[in-house]
Amino acid sequence: MIKIINLKKFLFPWISTDISKIKLNSIKLNSKKIIKNDIFIALYGNCNHGKNFIFEAIKNGSSIILIETKNILKHGIIYFIKNIPIIYFYNLNYSLSELSGKFYLHPSRYMNVIGITGTNGKTTISHFIAKWLFLLGEKIGIIGTLGYGCLNKMKKSKNTTNSAIKCQKLLNFFLKKNINTVVMEVSSHGLHQNRVNNINFFSAIFSNLSQDHIDYHKNMMQYEQSKWKLFSKLNVYKYIINYDDVIGKNWIKKIPNSIIVSTKKNSIKKFKNLKMYVKDIFFHYFGTKLSISSSWGSCVINTKIFGEFNINNLLLSFVALLTLGYNFKSLANVAENLTMPNGRMKIFYVKKIPRVIVDYAHTPDALEKVLSAIKLHFKKNIWSIFGCGGDRDKSKRRVMGKICDLYSINIILTNDNPRSESETKIFNDIKIGIKNLNKVNIIPSREHAIKFAIDNSNEKDIVLILGKGHEEHQVFKYKKVFFSDQILVNKILYKT
C-alpha cells in the first residue's frame, strides 16, 4: 500500500534532508523483489555489498535507496541517479529495526510480544503458549522456526528470526488482524544482527544455553553475549528464566527481579522472586504427571509431554501466560491437552513394530536430553539415526557421537544436510567420539538408514531419528532435495 511519507521526519534523527514528501510502498533488502516506490536497503553482506545492486533496484522502481557505510564521514551524503535519492547511512544495519518500526508505526508498542531465546526449546515454548491460548479460545501470532502465522495456519520462513524489516511488518500484520499477543523466537543470529533492536517485549524467556553455532559466534562466550543482549540491552518488561540451566543461574544474579522456574522443588524455594517449580513428578509411558507449586497457586496435571527438559519448557510457557494476566486455574484445567510441536518427540506406534520417534535434536545438549527422556519413559533399547550438518560447527560432532554411544545399542550415521562437505569426513568426525564402533553402521542415504533400522530392530526397541524433525529437505553441495523423516516413517509404518 502506497504511503506519502515526510522523508525529513522519517530519517530523523539520523539524517537531515530537505526532501519532504515521497511515495513509499515498502522496505526491501533484495533488489530483485523491488517494485515501484519501494525503499531499497543496501547493506553489507557476507560476499557482496547491496550497493552493487542499486541500478537493478532503480530499474525495478525504487523511489529511494539507503546505502550502509562504515565511514562516518560519508553519513548523510545524498546524490541522485535518475532523480532517485541515494543516501549514505552510517551503521544502517543497527538502525534498521527502528527505521522499519517507524515505517510500520511501531506495532510492538500496542501489543504484547513474548520473546524466547535459548539454544533449545524456543519452538516448543512458543508452541505451548500458542496451543494453551488456542485451548482457551484465543488467537496468538507466532514467529519462529516453523514459520509465521497462527496455530495450524503457518507460512514457512527462511530464518528462525526474520529480518528487522520482516519482524516489524509481521507485527503490524498481526495488529491489523486484531491479534494483540505475539510469541517470537529470538535467535542468537537475530540478536547479533540487530533484527529485534526496536521491538518492545512484554516478556523475555530464557530456556537454556549449550554448544551450537560456534561456526558463527567463534566461542561460547560470544554466543552467550548474543543471547544476553535480549535481557540487557533491549526493551523488556518481564524476565522469565530457567534456573535449572547454569547460565540461567548466573543471569538471575544479574536480574534480581526475574521470574524463576525449576523442575527441582528445593532449588528455588529460598528465592523471594515470583516463581514456579515442580514438587513431584512421574514419567510414564504416555507422558508426564506433575505437581506444580507457584506464586500463583498449585495444581496437579497429567500431560502428553515427554522429558524433563520439556517440563521446563511447559513451566516457562505457563509463567509467560500468567504474567499476561491469564487465570491460573483456567490454564491448569486445559494443560493436559497440550501437545508437542511438529517434529519434536513425534511418536509413531504400530503393534509388533518398534516404536519410532522423530526429533529435531541437532545439538549435543538436545541429543542427550532426548535420549535420556526416552530411557526415562520407555526403558527400551535405542537405535539412533543421526548425522551432522556440513560446513557448520565441527567441534560438536565427536561430542554427539559420544552421547549416542552412551545411550544407544545401535548407531546409524547418515546424511543431515552435508552441503559442500564430504559426508565421509563428517562421519569420521562423529566416530571419534564413539568408543564401541561395532555398534555403528554408516548408511549415507537417510531413507535407506531409516528403513534399515525399522527392518532390523524389534518391538522392544525404540528407533530414534534425529536432526530434522519438521524439516522437509536435504541440502547437498549443488542441490536441495525434498525429504521428510515423518513422511517416510508414515509410509513405512502405515503404508500411506
From Swiss-Prot:
Q: Where can the motif Meso-diaminopimelate recognition motif be found?
A: 416-419
**Residues binding UDP-N-acetyl-alpha-D-muramoyl-L-alanyl-D-glutamate:** L29, S31, N159, T160, T161, S187, Q193, R195
Q: Where in the cell is it found?
A: Cytoplasm
Q: Name one GO biological process term.
A: cell wall organization
Where is the PTM N6-carboxylysine found along the chain? K227
Presence of the UniProt keyword Cell wall biogenesis/degradation in the record: yes
One function term, GO molecular function aspect: UDP-N-acetylmuramoylalanyl-D-glutamate-2,6-diaminopimelate ligase activity
Post-translational modification summary for this protein: Carboxylation is probably crucial for Mg(2+) binding and, consequently, for the gamma-phosphate positioning of ATP.
Which GO CC terms are listed, alphabetically? cytoplasm
- Name any cofactors this protein relies on: Mg(2+)
| Reactions the enzyme catalyzes | UDP-N-acetyl-alpha-D-muramoyl-L-alanyl-D-glutamate + meso-2,6-diaminopimelate + ATP = UDP-N-acetyl-alpha-D-muramoyl-L-alanyl-gamma-D-glutamyl-meso-2,6-diaminopimelate + ADP + phosphate + H(+)
EC numbers for this chain: 6.3.2.13
Residues at which meso-2,6-diaminopimelate binds: R392, D416, N417, P418, R419, G467, E471
Keywords tagged on the record: ATP-binding, Cell cycle, Cell division, Cell shape, Cell wall biogenesis/degradation, Cytoplasm, Ligase, Magnesium, Nucleotide-binding, Peptidoglycan synthesis
Q: Which pathway, per its entry?
A: Cell wall biogenesis; peptidoglycan biosynthesis
Which positions are annotated as binding ATP?
A: G118, T119, N120, G121, K122, T123, T124
Q: What does this protein do?
A: Catalyzes the addition of meso-diaminopimelic acid to the nucleotide precursor UDP-N-acetylmuramoyl-L-alanyl-D-glutamate (UMAG) in the biosynthesis of bacterial cell-wall peptidoglycan.
The Swiss-Prot or TrEMBL record describes its family as follows: Belongs to the MurCDEF family. MurE subfamily.
What's the protein called, per UniProt? UDP-N-acetylmuramoyl-L-alanyl-D-glutamate--2,6-diaminopimelate ligase
Lineage, opening ranks: Bacteria, Pseudomonadati, Pseudomonadota, Gammaproteobacteria, Enterobacterales
